[in-house]
Amino acid sequence: MCAPSGPGNKFPDFQAETNEGFISSFYDWIGKDSWAILFSHPRDFTPVCTTELARLVQLAPEFKKRNVKLIGLSCDSADSHSKWADDILALYKMKCVGCDSEKKLPYPIIADEDRSLATELGMMDPDERDEKGNTLTARCVFIIGSDKTLKLSILYPATTGRNFDEILRVVDSLQLTAVKLVATPVDWKDGDDCVVLPTIDDNEAKKLFGEKIHTIDLPSGKHYLRMVPHPK
């Protein structure tokens, strides 16, 4: 197994122990048609990590709507993950008044105690260590498509919590642009206008989008900024 070198490359299959049991094949766990997000955190029972995973409990139904499976990873044991889950769920209930009550985490967490998987996937943070001096995992996010290729990777330092609403927005963009010949502009949200790919000439664009194209006039005189409604 080797780490994915960038978007478009095949994500490695692997086996792993989790708080929900043993996964004999990551590919089989994802399934044929689903997407997946593999996210690592530095350590169980720590403040930033607890806020992150509680937020993911709240957003899990949104990821499920998009056919995206979630799975976490840290170098803690499966037993530690299971005990920590009570804190995560308690914080979720405090932050999400009126939300459906969750009795268990809606995602498994990999127990990578020997750090072998995190090392292979390039998830380790050399600047973060436990009391024994062992390195810890960074806040990494891998988005993997149904074709088992890496679509996006983001690496956050331990001191910066992730914005999972942004991750959800990125999933919307990735899933749309995987099937439609458009790109998503700055601050795009699902339902907003998109841009025509620069690789598509005007004639082909007109065949695809008809009269819906709105070309924005710019000082250069180049007609490259072509907006189209969201292709539902």
UniProtKB/Swiss-Prot annotation:
<feature type="active site">
    <location>
        <position position="49"/>
    </location>
</feature>
<dbReference type="GO" id="GO:0005829">
    <property type="term" value="C:cytosol"/>
</dbReference>
<dbReference type="Pfam" id="PF00578">
    <property type="entry name" value="AhpC-TSA"/>
</dbReference>
<dbReference type="InterPro" id="IPR045020">
    <property type="entry name" value="PRX_1cys"/>
</dbReference>
<dbReference type="InterPro" id="IPR019479">
    <property type="entry name" value="Peroxiredoxin_C"/>
</dbReference>
<dbReference type="InterPro" id="IPR036249">
    <property type="entry name" value="Thioredoxin-like_sf"/>
</dbReference>
<keyword id="KW-0676">Redox-active center</keyword>
<dbReference type="Pfam" id="PF10417">
    <property type="entry name" value="1-cysPrx_C"/>
</dbReference>
<dbReference type="InterPro" id="IPR024706">
    <property type="entry name" value="Peroxiredoxin_AhpC-typ"/>
</dbReference>
<comment type="similarity">
    <text>Belongs to the peroxiredoxin family. Prx6 subfamily.</text>
</comment>
<dbReference type="GO" id="GO:0051920">
    <property type="term" value="F:peroxiredoxin activity"/>
</dbReference>
<dbReference type="InterPro" id="IPR013766">
    <property type="entry name" value="Thioredoxin_domain"/>
</dbReference>
<dbReference type="GO" id="GO:0005739">
    <property type="term" value="C:mitochondrion"/>
</dbReference>
<dbReference type="GO" id="GO:0045454">
    <property type="term" value="P:cell redox homeostasis"/>
</dbReference>
<feature type="domain" description="Thioredoxin">
    <location>
        <begin position="5"/>
        <end position="176"/>
    </location>
</feature>
<feature type="active site" description="Cysteine sulfenic acid (-SOH) intermediate">
    <location>
        <position position="49"/>
    </location>
</feature>
<comment type="function">
    <text>Thiol-specific peroxidase that catalyzes the reduction of hydrogen peroxide and organic hydroperoxides to water and alcohols, respectively. Plays a role in cell protection against oxidative stress by detoxifying peroxides.</text>
</comment>
<keyword id="KW-0049">Antioxidant</keyword>
<dbReference type="InterPro" id="IPR000866">
    <property type="entry name" value="AhpC/TSA"/>
</dbReference>
<keyword id="KW-0575">Peroxidase</keyword>
<keyword id="KW-0560">Oxidoreductase</keyword>
<protein>
    <recommendedName>
        <fullName>1-Cys peroxiredoxin</fullName>
        <ecNumber>1.11.1.-</ecNumber>
    </recommendedName>
</protein>
